[in-house]
Amino acid sequence: MSMLTRRGVGASVFAALFASSFAGAQAPQTVRVRGTIEKVDGQTLTVKLREGNTLAIKPADNARVTAMIKASLADIKVGDFVGVTAMPQPDGSQKAIGLHIFMAAQRGVVPTRFLPWDREPGSTMTNADVESNVADVDGQIMMVKYSDGEKKVIVPPNTPVVRFAPGDTGDLKPGAQIFVMAGQKMPDGTITAPAINVGRDGVAPPM
């Protein structure tokens, strides 16, 4: 084998090893998690998912815990920053299946936007400011505005509404329902959670 050939083979092997190492160092998969805490063991939460299976969630160092407390449609005022989980309607409006009211401190941190969601097949999420909120025979009609658009939202009377509030690890206890927006799936199958939203006093996350 010539020196040139040996160098070529060596370069190919090095490139393959480099590519393999790079693939192994890729960022963990980001996942959303909805479920109920079954057990707390040190820093590990055993969570039963709505699909019926369980997984282990480990809050990251300095994980942010945000509580969700029960609220109502009457609590939503013009100018509030809200998240609307909804189903698109034929006329282009959105029919809410859940609403959450952000804390003032979350404005500017949580982006205003409209995007596909996975609460139900075909569902959407709109983080936006409430421009109007009027009573209607079918509930409430809200106009909400986000960074590059606005949506008409129909809110039936039985739509679950929650308000975000400061929380802490004391809220993470058996029976509490949680939502993890951006968990990181680790090679061992556990989920590392940089932030956890947790229902307080039996509240279920509506998003």
Regions found by a protein language model. Give the residues of each.
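Short, flexible, surface-exposed loop segments at domain boundaries
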Residues: 2-8, 14, 18-207
